């Protein structure tokens, strides 16, 4: 058996030489240690219990049932295989953030790299700013509207609202030079 380099167009083997080194990346780039996972599961279960109580008091029995089934399935999948579709809706628990905290973004990486490899600043260029800047605000508002519906109807825990784009004010505070 071997791993060969293949021409993507013809399907022919490109080289008869054995590959000496190869990097294979995971399909999903999220890893959490066991203590982080255990803490996350405890918080998820606590928030689930609170949300189930709220839904039942509002007479939303179907929504409560739906949410309980969904979250318990998600927890089981994460425990068994380390992943579930929609795991991003639990990102706050695994990141150790509180409800409403700003999510981590690529901009955080830019800031950290600017501090590590430079003077701590970086330039942000926004082309077509008359279109792009309003879209930054719109991304947050649209995301919240969609996810609020999922929460209200028992498809997701309220923590799903914390897996979101930045608010415009958060984005503006992160920009060093724009």
What are the residue ranges of the model-derived segments?
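Extended, highly charged clamp/arch subdomains and adjacent linkers
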Residues: 1-177
């Amino acid at each position: 058996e071997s791993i060969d380099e293949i021409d993507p167009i013809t399907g022919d083997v490109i080289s008869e030489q054995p590959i000496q080194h190869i990097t294979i990346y995971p399909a999903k780039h999220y890893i959490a240690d066991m203590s982080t996972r255990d803490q996350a599961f405890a918080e998820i279960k606590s928030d689930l219990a609170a949300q189930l109580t709220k839904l039942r008091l509002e007479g939303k029995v179907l929504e409560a049932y739906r949410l309980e089934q969904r979250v318990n399935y998600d927890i089981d999948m994460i425990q068994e295989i380390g992943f579930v579709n929609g795991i991003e809706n639990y990102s706050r628990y695994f990141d150790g953030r509180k409800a409403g905290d700003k999510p981590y973004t690529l901009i955080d990486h830019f800031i950290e790299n600017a501090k590590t490899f430079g003077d701590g600043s970086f330039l942000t260029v926004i082309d077509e700013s008359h279109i792009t800047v309003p879209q930054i605000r719109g991304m947050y508002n649209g995301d919240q509207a969609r996810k609020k519906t999922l929460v209200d109807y028992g498809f997701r825990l309220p923590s799903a609202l914390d897996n979101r784009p930045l608010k415009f004010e958060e984005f503006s505070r992160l920009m060093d030079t724009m």
